[in-house]
Amino acid sequence: MLRRKTVKEYINEALEKYIEKGTYPWHMPGHKRRPLEKSDGSMCLKDDENGGQSPQNVDNISKSRENFWNGVYAHDFTEAKDLDDMHEPEMFIADSLAEMKKVYGTFATYMLVNGSTSGLMTAIHATCHRGDVILAARNCHKAVYNAICMLELEPEYIVPDYVDMRWHCGANQSMSDRMTDARGKDDCETQEGTDIRGEGDRETPERTDILGDISPDKLERAINTMIADGRKPSAVIITSPTYEGVISDIRIIAEIAHRYGIYLIVDEAQGAHLNFMEGYETAMEQGADIVIESLHKTMPALTQTSLLHVMDPKLDERVRRYLQIFQTSSPSYIFMQSMEKAVAFGANNRAVFVEYGRRLEIFAEKCDNLRNIRLFRPGVNVSKNDEGCSACKVFDHDEGRLVFVVRPGTVDGSGQIFTGAMLADILADRYGLIVEMASVSYVICISSVVDSVDSYDILFKR
């Protein structure tokens, strides 16, 4: 057989070229391709005279990748003598997990090297038996549906409602001055012709394609209907926060589920940072039985790293059993080190997360006056449940999830209806700002503690 003498490194070459473009990631992973520490051990999460984390500055990345492979190989281990086994930890991995358990206040916390997908698979197998009934939020991760198929479960779905967003005419033109409103030259005029400027800066609501929270009342009605039909669910599984950052009232949902003897699984993959932020409670604190968090999404951790938290001791044995089934038998020490470092960073640097919250608040306030694009802000331009509105569909929201919504009816300079996908293309092609996801009417930018003041300023000005 004729064999080629040389093999081209397509992946490595493509990534090198991508890095050289100098794009800025408004997407996961949460480390934003930047190291947490300098060579002297000091933190580099600050704006400095050399640009620090400036979106267009790739010098730090270029320097760090020179020794990338040497560093990776030097820290890649296996279950050898004097080392530990993630599946049966007895030494320093056990110590690390014990420390994480204290940080999160759980009965047990486990590292996931196969991502939150393996955690969701494990959680469902730990709470359900073959042929059982499960009540799932319709916007759950695809791993939930795969687990349903594997166990031949009978699913029942609870569907969140779409959220309305209020619009007004603002003064600032950043991020929207290249667009006009299809309803007329004056985009402060609603479809009914009512001027929404003037006293009180009146606003008009518009339906978005963003799903709201899981209504506790709707959940309880669904459970009662299922029980009346002889189909009591073994578990309820919901996503909170959602991809768009919408948070459900986990405390009430947990109380309802437990009242009927049903386990509650919360996919908190998008909210791994909430444990370290002020003003938020995690699903663990609010009564969920099993919670899965993706460290790599919003924390400075490598892609594919996640945590599974167990709150109900009765589930721990089955969880450990299925973790060994759904995870590789050769777990990466590099992944484990990354997870430990991310959790330690969060626990030991609370002030950094306070500063992160302050940056988000300043950025959000700047965005309040945008015209044809608005930042999704429950409590500001979207009603929250605590405002006494029976039609409200958002209990809370992660301010770190930047969702920019295009006003319905907005057109570009050529008269074409403007979409989220078009906004994503403009940000990427003209300014090198890469968003996480583009929908019909909005884009999602994932922020993290790593994003600098300069990063937010550049995003706003574009």
How should these model regions be labeled?
Residues 2, 7, 14, 103-106, ...:
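Conserved PLP-enzyme active-site core in the AAT-like
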Residues 43, 58-61, 175, 179, ...:
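Short hydrophobic transmembrane-like helices used for membrane targeting/insertion
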Residues 53-56, 173, 191:
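Low-complexity, intrinsically disordered or signal/transmembrane-proximal segments
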Residues 110-112, 236-239, 444-448:
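Short glycine-rich or small-residue beta-strand-to-loop segments that form or flank ligand, phosphate
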Residues 47, 73-115:
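Conserved N-terminal alpha-helix of the aminotransferase class I/II PLP-enzyme fold
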Residues 362-462:
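Conserved C-terminal alpha-helix-loop-beta "cap" of PLP-dependent enzymes
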Residues 180-208:
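Long, intrinsically disordered low-complexity tandem-repeat segments
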Residues 1-70:
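N-terminal glycine-rich, Lys/His-bearing helix-loop that initiates the first secondary-structure elements
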